[in-house]
């Protein structure tokens, strides 16, 4: 996450999430109903301490978690659940290049942890995501008022 060399990938996603964080912070009626999570595929470099540094640098205004795992094996069940594949890129001499190949996916989950939308590179726009968050919250409020 923190070592991604593709400026149109993880760094762009972080910038969009940062903008969403700011948009949420301007809406006190919904900011405490949303949690943002950034998850690293690279536990070797993205240690808990490194992720804490990134969080401090981003200065989130909302509930935004920067997550990593102990090992790649620990992360694999989560990746499998979300159908997210990643692969280390190897150099010709057999050493790891330090890079990963993956499709950028950002997931919008509802309060029951159901995937409600998946944003890819071309559709990860802060206003679009914010509108989808508002739509989910409206839907949840309507369901809550209908429940006995």
Which residues does each predicted region cover?
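Conserved short-loop catalytic and cofactor-binding motifs
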Residues: 5, 38-39, 66, 94, ...
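Conserved redox-active cysteine motifs that mediate thiol-disulfide chemistry
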Residues: 1-16
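Structured loop/turn residues at secondary-structure junctions
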Residues: 2, 42-43, 121
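Structural microenvironment flanking redox-active thiols in thiol-disulfide oxidoreductases
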Residues: 12-78
């Amino acid at each position: 996450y923190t070592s991604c060399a593709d400026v149109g990938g993880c760094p762009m996603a972080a910038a969009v999430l940062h903008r969403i964080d700011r948009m949420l912070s301007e809406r006190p009626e919904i900011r405490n109903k949303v949690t943002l999570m950034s998850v690293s595929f690279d536990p070797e470099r993205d240690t808990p301490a490194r992720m804490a540094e990134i969080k401090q640098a981003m200065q989130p205004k909302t509930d935004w978690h920067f997550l990593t795992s102990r090992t790649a094996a620990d992360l694999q069940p989560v990746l499998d659940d979300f159908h997210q594949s990643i692969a280390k890129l190897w150099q010709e001499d057999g050493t790891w290049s330090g890079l990963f190949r993956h499709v950028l996916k950002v997931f919008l989950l509802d309060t029951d942890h159901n995937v409600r939308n998946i944003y890819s590179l071309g559709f990860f726009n802060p206003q679009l995501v914010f509108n989808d968050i508002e739509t989910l919250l409206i839907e949840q409020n309507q369901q809550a008022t209908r429940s006995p």
